[in-house]
A protein has these predicted regions:
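Hydrophobic ligand-binding cavity/cleft-lining segments
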Residues: 1-41
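Intrinsic-disorder/low-complexity, polar/charged segments enriched in Ser/Thr/Lys/Arg/Asp/Glu/Gln
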Residues: 2-7, 44, 54, 79, ...
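Generic structural detector for well-ordered beta-strands
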Residues: 7-11, 46-48, 58, 83
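Hydrophobic pocket/interface hotspot
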Residues: 17-21, 27, 45, 59, ...
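Glycine-rich portal/gate segments that line the openings of hydrophobic small-molecule binding cavities
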Residues: 29, 34-76
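Beta-strand/loop substructures that line and gate deep hydrophobic ligand-binding cavities in soluble
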Residues: 72-123
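Short, highly charged C-terminal tails/helix-capping segments
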Residues: 126-130
Length: 130
């Protein structure tokens, strides 16, 4: 299952964004409304939103072209990527991309909430760095 957020322009360089995305604490600022729990770890974070189960993410490779977050739960096979494309010294195009391997029943249950989550993340990032 692949989901995409809309492309946005962020008023930060791709290096500045990559530096932000390396730190688990910074992800709290990107979380949608309804955040009920947020815990950081050395290599990631766990969060809970109202009406959804808690999700633990591990921060993987972070470069000036993107950041890859993967599930910290080995039984869930998915990744969330922030794809970054430098436009100028102080502007970057960003897009959230989700890729997950789920059975058809789970896919049917999670597809809409995940798309809403990706849209909310995109909106928050855009609002923070206009």
């Amino acid at each position: 299952m692949n989901l995409e957020g809309r492309k946005i322009i962020v008023n930060k360089s791709s290096k500045e964004l990559a530096d932000l995305l390396k730190s688990p604490e910074n992800y709290k600022d990107f979380m949608p409304d309804g955040l009920q729990k947020f815990e950081t770890r050395e290599d990631g974070f766990k969060f809970g939103l109202k009406g959804m189960p808690e999700i633990a993410l591990k921060i993987g490779e972070v470069t000036e072209s993107g950041a890859v977050l993967t599930s910290a739960n080995p039984s869930l096979d998915f990744s969330l990527t922030a794809a970054l494309q430098s436009i100028s010294d102080n502007q970057t195009e960003a897009q959230m991309l989700f890729e997950g391997k789920f059975n058809p029943f789970i896919k049917m249950m999670v597809e809409k909430p995940l798309q809403n989550f990706i849209n909310s993340l995109t909106d928050k990032i855009e609002a923070l760095y206009k």
